């Protein structure tokens, strides 16, 4: 578990290294799906329509064939701006089958947010719902000048008529998903893919600070993390388990679980476009769901909400919480409510790690721990002050090396070199330690990143927004603890001299420009000056607990 190299301390996994196939994602996934052709793989949680493995595999190849007719080339980007839908699976894997890259973002993003994320990777194609298209159509050519075709995907048969009308009346840039897959699924070339070098997906992450950056993950990155996770999760799943697919597929946590691991293992996934507590619980009851992957706000519902008692949840065995830390108090409340019948598990990771690096093994829970190191990885704990490797039990920045570490940030070598050192270790930005049993503990989350409802909210993004207001001279944003939500943004603003501005005016101006979870639920305060270091760095910690009277 501890190894010494040139006098430096490193930590290995308790698990032996595993053999990870060097294959492209779609080759691996299609093989597993085709092996169980009659098994139900996906269920639409809105219509209850079921999709067999055979149907999903055929549709993946039809997507590839349709994209081939659109002249897709290796390395072309297809931007996915969709909620969780059954069509997500074939769109994702069909694009990769053609050597394309999928870049996935939140469908709730505003035009401004899309311009800072998806637009930066120059997608050639977009897959969107009608609602998203209506939001972006007037700015399409300005924000996405590289886009040649927009593929419209229906939700539960609700917008088919409108989509058909649009495809007839548009200037040819719009087509429906049904038109895309209207083929035999056979006429597409075999594209040569180098699993270790070729990018498969570009999700977005802020890292520990700053604006969002595209994270280039190779085919081998995500295949590796699928196998690494599966290795220590074998006892969690049973052959015919049904799982709930409520985590956003555009988030690396949901993507790896539902587009990779669950599909590979052949579990039935009930897909829900967005989390609605009653519908979520109804579906657990209806389909006898055994495992649900959740975020802390959903865990709090299981712990405290009275509606939970109205449903038969006896089939539920495991809740796996991720994306943000789950407190031991909430975990204990759930165990008490379900009389110890439910297993509560947690893991830890980052988009840059594809995403998992620690997972708590079944039956081996240690309170407060993020888990143990997955196989085929090496960890080191370094001193934030000196950069020296530290020993067991010593607190420092956690750094990870392994086949799941990203290729780098899209077109941003400087940012890549700041987080991946010369030896290939990714600096997580989190402070923690490892104990004598190989369990890792996070004692200080990355200071600047705000985690709201499991989503990353980079303060720098909101500060840039506030600073763009003509009456704002300076701004700083911090996270405020807010119970079920985790943290919410709180703004501090310096008004320009001889100008006047109210909190309501600033909120009314800012909120339409950002996704709902980024709203300033912690309020905005006006102060004389923003505290800064001698080098001009924002001293957020000085404002973290500062609570001045509002003007």
Curated annotation (Swiss-Prot):
Q: Which UniProt keywords apply?
A: ATP-binding, Ligase, Magnesium, Nucleotide-binding, Phenylpropanoid metabolism
Catalysed reaction(s) here are: (E)-4-coumarate + ATP + CoA = (E)-4-coumaroyl-CoA + AMP + diphosphate; (E)-4-coumarate + ATP + H(+) = (E)-4-coumaroyl-AMP + diphosphate; (E)-4-coumaroyl-AMP + CoA = (E)-4-coumaroyl-CoA + AMP + H(+)
**Which BP terms from GO are recorded?**
phenylpropanoid metabolic process
Residue segments, region SBD1: 276-346
From the Swiss-Prot or TrEMBL record, what is one GO molecular function term? ATP binding
**Where is the segment annotated SBD2?**
347-409
Report the pathway entry. Phytoalexin biosynthesis; 3,4',5-trihydroxystilbene biosynthesis; 3,4',5-trihydroxystilbene from trans-4-coumarate: step 1/2
User: What family does the entry list?
Assistant: Belongs to the ATP-dependent AMP-binding enzyme family.
Q: What is this protein called?
A: Probable 4-coumarate--CoA ligase 1
Species name = Dictyostelium discoideum
């Amino acid at each position: 578990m501890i190894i010494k190299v040139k006098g430096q301390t490193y930590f290995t996994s308790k698990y032996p290294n595993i053999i990870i196939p060097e294959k492209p994602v779609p080759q691996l996934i299609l093989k597993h799906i085709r092996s169980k052709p009659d098994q139900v793989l996906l269920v639409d949680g809105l219509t209850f329509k079921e999709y067999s493995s055979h149907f999903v595999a055929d549709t993946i190849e039809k997507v590839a064939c349709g994209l081939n007719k659109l002249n897709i080339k290796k390395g072309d980007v297809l931007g996915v701006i969709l909620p969780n839908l059954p069509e997500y699976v074939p769109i994702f894997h069909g694009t990769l089958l053609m050597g394309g890259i999928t870049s996935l973002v939140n469908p709730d993003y505003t035009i401004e947010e899309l311009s800072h994320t998806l637009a930066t990777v120059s997608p050639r194609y977009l897959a969107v719902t009608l609602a998203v298209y209506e939001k972006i159509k007037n700015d399409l050519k300005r924000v996405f000048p590289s886009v040649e075709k927009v593929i419209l995907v229906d939700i539960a048969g609700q917008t088919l008529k409108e989509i058909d009308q649009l495809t007839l009346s548009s200037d040819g840039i719009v087509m429906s998903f049904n038109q895309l897959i209207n083929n035999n699924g056979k006429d597409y070339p075999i594209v040569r893919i180098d699993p270790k070098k070729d990018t498969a997906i570009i999700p977005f992450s802020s890292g520990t600070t700053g604006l969002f950056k595209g994270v280039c993950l190779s085919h081998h990155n995500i295949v590796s993390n699928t196998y690494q996770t599966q290795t220590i999760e074998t006892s969690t799943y049973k052959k015919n388990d049904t799982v709930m697919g409520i985590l956003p597929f555009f988030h690396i946590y949901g993507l790896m679980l539902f587009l990779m691991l669950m599909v590979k293992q052949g579990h039935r996934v009930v897909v829900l476009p967005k989390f609605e507590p009653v519908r979520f619980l109804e579906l657990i009851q209806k389909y006898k769901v055994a495992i649900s992957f959740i975020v802390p706000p959903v865990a709090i519902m299981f712990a405290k909400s009275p509606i939970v008692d109205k449903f038969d949840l006896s089939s539920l065995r495991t809740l796996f919480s991720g994306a943000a830390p789950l407190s031991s108090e909430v975990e204990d409340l759930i165990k008490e409510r379900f009389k110890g019948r439910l297993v509560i598990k947690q893991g830890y990771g980052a988009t840059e790690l594809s995403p998992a690096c620690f997972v708590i093994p079944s039956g081996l829970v240690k309170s407060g721990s993020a888990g143990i190191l997955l196989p085929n990885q090496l960890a080191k704990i370094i001193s934030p002050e000196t950069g020296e490797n530290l020993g067991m039990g010593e607190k420092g920045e956690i750094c990870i090396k392994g086949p799941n570490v990203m290729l780098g940030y899209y077109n941003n070598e400087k940012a890549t070199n700041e987080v991946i050192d010369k030896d290939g270790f990714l600096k997580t930005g989190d402070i923690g330690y490892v104990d004598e049993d190989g369990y890792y503990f996070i004692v200080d989350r990355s200071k600047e990143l705000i985690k709201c409802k499991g989503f990353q909210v980079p303060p720098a993004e909101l500060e840039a927004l506030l600073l763009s207001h003509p009456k704002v001279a300076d701004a700083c944003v911090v996270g405020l603890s807010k119970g079920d939500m985790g943290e919410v943004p709180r703004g501090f603003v310096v008004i320009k001299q001889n100008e006047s501005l109210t909190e309501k005016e600033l909120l009314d101006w800012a909120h339409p420009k950002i996704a709902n979870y980024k709203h300033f639920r912690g309020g905005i305060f006006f102060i004389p000056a923003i505290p800064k270091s001698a080098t001009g760095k924002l001293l957020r910690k000085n404002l973290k607990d500062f609570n001045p009277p509002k003007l």
